[in-house]
Amino acid sequence: MSAEQFVGRWKLVESENFEDYLKEVGVGLLLRKAACAAKPTLEIKVNGNKWHVNQLSTFKNTTLEFTLGVEFDETTPDGRQFKSTITIEDGKVVHVQKRIKDSDHDSVITRWFEGEKLITTLQSGSVISRRAYIRE
């Protein structure tokens, strides 16, 4: 798997169990409803080990900049803070969010390809959400 495969604009086309995932990680009801109604587009740019990911939606636009394998401070769209590390393992991009506050919950976000779709799973505890994107 080449990191270059991820480069481009990706539009959300399928979403399963996303609200349950958001509830598991502690996102409030109003923000959960808004996030579930949004149909985000991902803009991904890669330069060597440095990645730049914009998530664009009517809910909120966010930017994530990171270097593969290097821990960084991450603030989620709803304001939760994590120590995060993103790596490539077995052809998948694995994003580990480790909580800073005891009231938050760790998550693992994994991205890979199935045919022409970019698949994303979000897992916290036993709750797993699956989302699929297609290239714009």
Curated annotation (Swiss-Prot):
GO cellular component term, pick one: perinuclear region of cytoplasm
Which residues are involved in binding a fatty acid?
111, 131-133
Extract the SUPFAM superfamilies matched here.
Answer: Lipocalins (SSF50814)
Please tell me whether the keyword Plastid is annotated for this protein.
Answer: no
Superkingdom of the source species: Eukaryota
Instruction: Please tell me whether the keyword Hydrolase is annotated for this protein.
Output: no
| One GO process term, biological-process aspect | fatty acid transport
Q: List keywords of the entry alphabetically.
A: Lipid-binding, Transport
Q: Which Pfam families match?
A: Lipocalin (PF00061)
Q: Which family does it belong to?
A: Belongs to the calycin superfamily. Fatty-acid binding protein (FABP) family.
Instruction: Return the protein name.
Output: Fatty acid-binding protein homolog 5
Q: Which organism is it from?
A: Caenorhabditis elegans
Identify the gene encoding this protein: lbp-5
